Amino acid sequence: MADTTPPLSEPVSWLYGMHKASASMYDAVKSYAENAEGFYADELKKAVYATERSGADIYTAISDIAGSTKNPPFQMFLSEYLTTVKTSGNPEWYLKKKLEELRVEEKTAEEKRASSLSVFAEIFVSVFVAGILFAVIVFLILGIMSGGSPLPLGAVVYGILPLGTAGFLLALDILCPSPKQPKKHLGRKTVPTTEKITEGKATQKSHQYPAAASKEFTAEEQTIRKKLERYDKHLRGRRFLQSPAAELLKKPHLVFVFSAPAAAFAGILLFFSAHIPFRFVLPSVFLVCFTPYAVLSLIQRKKRSEAETEFPSVCRIISSAADRGLPLSKCLAAAAKENSGVLKKELTATVRDISFGGEVYQSLFRFADRLSFPSAKRTVLFAAETGHYSRDISLPFQTGADDAAHSLSLRTGQKSGMQLYVLIMYISYFVFIFVQFILSGVFIDAVSAANTAADTGMYLGILTDAVLIHGICCGLAAGKMSGGGISSGIFHACVLLAAGLAASIAVWIL
């Protein structure tokens, strides 16, 4: 199972920003525990719970967590954090230095992980690309020449290749886990104030509306609620019908509503066709079903990547405008005016939302929800939290820009280091297709003419299956190595499978 523990620099950066905004130790710790997810947030939630429920002071609660946590770096950080607070009262300087130190360590660790990924990629290319190709050629030639059983060749194609690829993908998932997403929904009723909470006391913040008391709905109210729910469903359906392309780009998996029935229909037609071999039916169904999803996911990933690349510069523009004394709404308008990339549309929509009377932070929450990547959500949450203790708008967005740029540099370094191996896998697969042409068009025909007892048809079928299965396996591995996840793997698999299927049909026709 993948380790979803975020980097230690994440809580350190959050605490540093909160202390810089003049928040107390209790407020800073509680803020991170409430607004983050993962191992560190869970540990700090225990300290907050002990303070609120057991009456312990925050120093004792964090000291207990430091003594019980099973993460040595986090344990050391908490001990140093407590010592700094007790001795100097303000841990801002320590947190700044610790953050710089952790970012250097994380960059070094990422370089080591990229080196390990390169080793895994070389193993996969050597064993499951070149090795499989060599094994297929050897077992094919020996089996046809000796007239033996095709079982060894079938074991390689139908057993070793898919199982080995699955093991490789699992190892990559453990070595390079996906980042932990923050809380998905940000539409809280939050209006930051400059009120400060007494340290160590769990008082209610004035910016949070109290929870509504539970009550029994009347029959009329229940009828109205049901009508509203039906209206929401109708509105979503109407929005989809008005602009299906836009909705599909937001949620590519919805395309399966159309592609899955189309794939089933195509499969039935091909299955009952007397001229199409059955081994071409399943690959064709796979392509019809998954190609639209792969293309839409590719467009979505490209736009998201461009947005993540632009986000640090947008945060810096907002921070720079705030330094000149502009309110947050004007800072957002300045960012929308200066930006010319993919975020311009979202920034303009946010500014328009505010101009129509929307609350600034609620509009920012909706902006982050639309972007839907961790750095945007974390920055908006952080800005809302620091707004309770400081009127300095520049601080959270400058911190968000630094955090986003650091995360982006780590991911970019990993992707650039793996592109070479993705290219090698593509080249190796097309070499496999070329070998298929040679073996099917020259060698097998020559052996069939010289030895009529050889069952060349079965070997030719296994060779065709090897090309098709190899295309799917190489595509999934290429997607994982490029850092795009399962959707990227499906895209590469569709490209390679389409090439392999076209080559196999050409061999069958010729």
Regions found by a protein language model. Give the residues of each.
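Membrane-cytosol interface segments
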Residues: Y158-A245, S297, D323
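Short, charged cytosolic
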Residues: T84-V104, Q204-G237, G387-D402
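Juxtamembrane/interface alpha-helical elements of multi-pass membrane proteins
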Residues: M1-A66, M76, H185-K215, G267-D369, ...
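Membrane-helix interface "capping/anchor" motifs
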Residues: Q300-K303, K480-I490
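Loop-to-transmembrane boundary segments
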Residues: L117-F124, H207-F265, S416-I424
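Hydrophobic alpha-helical transmembrane segments
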Residues: Y59-E80, Y94-R113, R225-L235, Q362-F382, ...
